[in-house]
Amino acid sequence: MSKYIHPATVEAALRVASSLLPDDYREVTEGHGHDPLNALIVGVHNSDSVYFEVPNGEIAGMAGVHNGGQIWMLCTPAIYEYPHTFAREAKRYVNARTEKLLWNIVDKRNKVHIKLLRFLGFKFLREFPYGPNNLSFIEFCRVQS
């Protein structure tokens, strides 16, 4: 696919979980009530998942798609070191997906992911309270034509 996109591994999950962006950590723990490492390992085993590298070899994040088109992504601060490379590779990953519909929800406070989702061509559908803390989440989707 790309020299920066690789099949996800448990080792990559450990590296991402240990250096998540603060907003991603907060979304997983406060928004979903999950442990980030556990969520990433589940993602490795239960979805078609990858990890993203940037030119200096750092892992910038992991992403995957579950059956039914539920897409997810968690990132590290390495996305800020090579923002154009990361955004281009994320777009390459999303554009290569064959699902007719990609969808999920995002914590309204996670401005970095909302900006990235917009860049990747996702549309925002509705806002609603979600999770153990009833935080504001936004449903998003992308329909392939």
Predicted regions and their residues:
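A short, internal acetyl-CoA/4′-phosphopantetheine-binding micro-motif in the GNAT/acyltransferase core
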Residues: 72-88
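Short amphipathic alpha-helix that is part of the acyltransferase structural core
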Residues: 1-34
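A conserved beta-strand-loop-helix scaffold within acyl/acetyltransferase catalytic domains
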Residues: 63-69
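Active-site rim helix/loop that mediates acceptor-substrate recognition in acyltransferases
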Residues: 28-47
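Conserved beta-hairpin
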Residues: 46-61
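C-terminal "cap" of GNAT-fold acetyltransferases
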Residues: 130-145
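Conserved beta-strand-loop-alpha-helix junction that forms the acyl-donor binding cleft
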Residues: 103-118, 123, 129-133
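Conserved acyl-CoA
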Residues: 88-102, 111, 120
